[in-house]
Amino acid sequence: MIELATMSSLCPDWNLSEIIDGMKCHGYKGLEPRVEWGHACGIEADLSGDERRAIRRQMEGEGLDICCIATGVRMAEVDREKRAEHVEDLKRYIDLAADLGCGLVRTFGGQRDRDREWQYVVDYVVEGYAQVVDWAEERGVVILMETHDDWCSSPPVRAVVEQVGHAHLKILWDFMHTQRVLERPGESFSIFAEHVAHLHAHDGQYVDGKMQVGALGEGVIDHQTPLQLLGKMGFAGYFSVEVIHKVGAGGGAEGVMAQYANAFRRMLASI
């Protein structure tokens, strides 16, 4: 079954209790906190053990999940010393996820070395993930590599996951980003569907040559087709709304949360 989740990026000024109220009002099951951005929910790697236990109790008491920890970790970071820092950061986020009862941690490939061929870059990224997948397995957490930035195209992402060859590295399929590089949903699905463990959702329109995020089902990004394909294969995971509002910008979160929930339910009903 495909469940509905929201990222804290949608409502960065809401504390955890406010997020829970919004989730329950609009039928969301999962929360995906975006760490490192100072969101009011306060979910970060520096939480104490007591704070982690309290958050977990609060979510579980409401029948809700922390479904994924969204990090800014980048495994294609060209500078090896900086990449080593990303690896250590990822270990801390895996520990955070485990303590919160969360089974997924999102990472990026990030900007690749443009002077190198793809196979070299894939090998380099594989080397990074290989340093941490056993750590993730020990803690019962799956690392996700998102189709994002230099890694919007499906084949390189699949290549990384298959070369690592570990059950605790999977793919986060962001429907928008694969389509932005002109892949049809069916093409992406055929390339890596068996490795997909989490989904990101945000619709939009091209305005002056740039993507402007908007209401689900009213833009140019096809969410219906990939949901249908995944549903037929028995995918069980989260469709996580990634509409990003800046901290302190105010307004908009409640309406976006409601609109995406209603559109998502209409899409599921037609599958």
Predicted regions and their residues:
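A short acidic, glycine-rich active-site loop
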Residues: 41-45, 120, 217-220
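A short acidic, helix-capping loop that chelates divalent metal ions and anchors anionic groups
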Residues: 38-43, 75-79, 111-118, 180-182, ...
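Aromatic- and glycine-enriched glycan-recognition loops and surfaces
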Residues: 44-53
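Short glycine-centered, acidic/aromatic-flanked micro-motifs in structured strand/loop junctions
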Residues: 8, 71-73, 109, 143-147, ...
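Active-site acidic/histidine proton-transfer and metal-coordination neighborhood
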Residues: 17-18, 22, 53, 57-65, ...
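A short beta-strand-loop structural module common to alpha/beta enzyme folds
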Residues: 29-40
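Conserved beta-strand positions in the central sheet of alpha/beta enzyme cores
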Residues: 32, 68-70, 106, 144, ...
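Histidine-acidic metal/acid-base catalytic patches
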Residues: 1-29, 60-62, 138, 153-271
